[in-house]
């Protein structure tokens, strides 16, 4: 049985570079402590729509108060992946959403998130082709190297589904 979750892909152009914002999970999280994940993720509560859930998770996890019209649907994906050290598997139906916030968004991470990291889109894409570390920047501009094994957001079907939408969203002439 699949449980329903939402994923927010926060796209940005920072100093002209197209990329994605990833959250670093808090070190006390039961799954993937200290790992890097999509900017906001979480379970969809009973009776809650996927869109309402992703807006709630963005507020709770990274302090962004987004409007529904700032979201682009990225589709839904069935995913199964190991639960890390706790064992077993997660079986999810993930509803993906994309948003574009240029520059450095006004993140205010909650207790589940340590901080935010910007990774160029081509660097993130390369993570699917090999195990090289990802070079990025923290919101304060300092350089950051994310070991490949610290990524917990690599879901092939979802990436294949949202990649072209991200490229369109990040095109220089796009404003959404």
Protein language model features and the residues they cover:
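Nudix hydrolase/Nudix homology domain
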Residues: 34, 40, 75-84, 88-176
